[in-house]
Amino acid sequence: MARAASGRLAGRTILITGASQGLGRAVALACAREGANLLLVARRAGPLEEARAEAESLGARAIAVAADVGDASEVERVAAAALDAFERVDVLVNNASELGPTPMPYLIDTDPDALRRVLEVNLHGPFLLTRALLGPMLAAGSGSVVNVSSDAGVVGYPGWGAYGVSKAASDQMTRIWASELEDTGVRVNSVDPGDMATAMHAAALPEDDPAELARPEDRTAVFVYLASAESAGVTGRRFEAAAFPVPGAEPAHAQ
């Protein structure tokens, strides 16, 4: 199917990691409805292909690349595939996340290899992918990088050690990227999507009733905003998706 000819993201190319399910898939479909080209990345090829097909059914041009963003060589392959297919990426959404072992152990009981794996996916991968795609953004004088955050990176919840440390570091990396890229036209922000009915939330907090949690598709408005021209000049900020009012509106709350 031909891609959508109009929309707030028409003509923009967006790369989304962790796009096979949950928030990543919901953001991909929201961007597809707004006319974006998509490059979708996730580890599992089957669900990723389903997400790609669904995006194309909405009129988007969508390409799927099965890869593990916690592996530096695979990050290089993703970046090469993106630049080969689209020449440049306008928007990067670093959404892929690794929770770590469950039930979630206290730091004193955390295996060092498990901590390393969480940091590779949640911090090292986004750093490498951002760096790999930054050149064409700088040459064009525009671009948007969105890192998915969590309140576990702000509050010291017991048992959330590996994940919380990775998200705290990700927020700081967002601020530093934004400062270093000031006045280049490339903006870097983070979004805390809040509690949602996702597989990751179920793994972390199996006692929670998913019917009482937000759906991922209800938390996509801020991502479309940050991917669009409406957010030009907005950088170095931390948004709470639950507080973002309507598509295209100014955020109700940002930090």
Segment roles from a protein language model:
Residues T130, S166:
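Active-site helix of classical SDR
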Residues S150:
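Residue(s) in the substrate-gating loop at a strand-loop-helix junction
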Residues G46, A66-V78, P112:
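The beta1-alpha1 cofactor-binding region of Rossmann-like NAD(H)/NADP(H)-dependent oxidoreductases
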Residues G135, A178-E180:
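Alpha-helical segment proximal to the catalytic Tyr-Lys
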Residues P103-L107, D111-R116:
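Substrate-binding pocket helix/loop in short-chain dehydrogenase/reductase
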Residues D183-T184, S190-P193, T198, E207-H253:
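C-terminal helical subdomain
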Residues S20-Q21:
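Conserved glycine-rich cofactor-binding loop
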